[in-house]
Amino acid sequence: IREGYKNITFGENGSFNRGMCAVGDYVYVSGRSENSSGASAYLNKYSGVTGELVEKLMLGSEAAMAYYPCNDVIKDSKDNICITNLTLDASSNPLAVLWVNLEDGSLTKVASVSTTSKYRIDHVALWGDVSTGNFTVYAAIRESKLVMRWIYENGKLSKSETCTVKSTYSGSTFGMAPRMIVIDEDLLTSGKVELSK
């Protein structure tokens, strides 16, 4: 951050601001007003050059959901910005992917994914284009070796898959709040583990 723009602060030790992504010349940081399912959600938009807070974009009320809303902000392969919730039990409280209109903060739900077992999902990754309805949602399951994939075609869930990785580094599982990073359509990673689709 350049001198004079030291305005990036995170209250409550960052528990209200758990995700960020860069698109173009800007960095977007997810935010919620409190740690509750009814919290209001927002994105802080920062200049990628100076670190200056450009805008606090309030998001639509559709963001409010269990367990905590607006836990992360992510982008797809075409730089469409989406937010996701934190779910402690994806079998009863699905993880939702909401596409953000960066002009007015309105939200469009593009995916709602669930699991057959009680899995916690903190973060997901996207590959594809949510604007066309053709994309894939990836998640590494907390404290496990499981990776889940939900494939959407023309806006509808067409397939879901689970894979177990052989090993993880540096522990025996992915850990507390793992993130998946899609490298290309055939390779993704969570920390030090590289997985082939």
Predicted regions and their residues:
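Blade-loop segments of beta-propeller domains
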Residues: 41-85
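Repeated scaffold domains used in trafficking and secretory/extracellular systems
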Residues: 13-20, 62-76, 112-130, 167-186, ...
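Entry beta-strands of beta-propeller and related beta-repeat scaffolds
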Residues: 25-29, 79-83, 132-138, 186-197
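Beta-strand-rich domains and repeat architectures in extracellular enzymes and scaffolds
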Residues: 4-38
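Beta-propeller fold detector
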Residues: 1-9, 53-61, 106-115, 157-170
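Short glycine/acidic-enriched loop and turn motifs that connect beta-strands
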Residues: 33-38, 87-92, 142-146
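Loop-centered beta-sheet repeat module
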Residues: 126, 133-150
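Beta-propeller blade signature
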Residues: 40-51, 93-104, 149-152
